[in-house]
Amino acid sequence: MILNEIFHECIKDLGGIVSVASTGTDGKPHIANTWNKYLIITEDEKILIPCFGFRKTEKNAETQPYVEIVVGSDKVQGKMGMGTGCLLSGTAKFEKDGALFNLVHDKLKFANRVLIFTPESCKQTI
């Protein structure tokens, strides 16, 4: 199991933010954001992120699928007080049809694609 208890506690805070960092072919980082409330976790621990924007992230993932994601909440006890987060590393791919897209689109009609994130690690940050 890669996704730890702190991760699951953080995403219960529906107002918490999610940041997705990707790298372009020019080597420059790009950050895109969404909300915890939109994440869907599959039984095999894939994280599904509904997308309407995320165009640059999608373009970056075509050539460099390795991304990092940060989730956080100020309502979860951290190592030094209230507030903590998790840094996740793994790979991303985008789909605009298929079973995982349909799962997301059935719940969130604005999604015209889904970012499918496969985590390789999940570490508490603070």
Sequence positions of predicted segments:
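Binding-site signature for planar aromatic cofactors or substrates
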Residues: 1-126
